[in-house]
Amino acid sequence: MNLLVNFLAYVVGIPILAGLFCLVIPERLKILTRLLAFIVTLVSLAATVRIFILKPMYWPPVPVPAFIVDNLSALAGLGISFFALVVTVYSFGYIEKNNGKYFGYLLMTLGSALGAVFANNLILLVVFWGILPALLYLLVTLRQTIAASASAKKALIIIGATDALMIFGIGLLWKMTGTFAMDGMHIALDGVLPYAAFLCILIASFAKAGAV
């Protein structure tokens, strides 16, 4: 497969790998950590601009794409990358300690968020969706204060509970359609199940947005 075919996989995977690398960079080399975070978020923004122009995109192209970019996900991906770059640059002024952990978690959050918005498979969506609250918890607890720890635990409990609703909603979708591929779902709005699935996923989405 050529670069263009694998483009979506790189856009999701590179920030996650770069974030893992930041975790092992010594604190004395915080300039390297910051430079890496800036470069990755800048490249991510450029990549999502390209994705927005080239949409629709699929990866892998056959038989069932794991990632799909349409108009909505392209716009969401562009916004995620833009704000990741803004947060990264803004953080240079106030993050003094734990640079490796902070920017590592931030980059992994970027990759996981892009993975969630581009995911076509609902199982893949749940995986990326579940990683995000864990990273949020780790970012908040970097402040190492009692208040921060308590807030992080409350957010994690709320998100964890509502994520169970999302999984239940996805289970209902699978029961109705027999597939986890979103582009292959054709749902008739008959009976209670479609509306129950919608409400479960909607509540989980609002809970995650509120926590973030």
Listing of model-derived features with the role each one plays in the protein:
Residues 1-104, 176-188:
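Transmembrane helix-loop-helix hairpins at membrane boundaries of multipass inner-membrane proteins
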Residues 3, 72-74, 121-122, 154, ...:
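Short alpha-helical transmembrane interface motifs in multi-pass membrane proteins
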Residues 19-20, 82-85, 163-168, 205-212:
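Transmembrane alpha-helical segments of multi-pass membrane transport proteins and ion-pumping complexes
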Residues 20-24, 89-98, 137-147, 202, ...:
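Helix-loop junctions at the membrane interface of multi-pass solute transporters
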Residues 39, 57, 150-151, 155, ...:
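Short helix-boundary/re-entrant hairpin motifs in multi-pass inner-membrane proteins
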Residues 58-76, 122-133, 137, 205:
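Membrane-interface helix-loop-helix modules in multi-pass inner-membrane proteins
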Residues 102-108, 112-192, 207-209:
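Alpha-helical multi-pass transmembrane bundles of energy-transducing inner-membrane proteins
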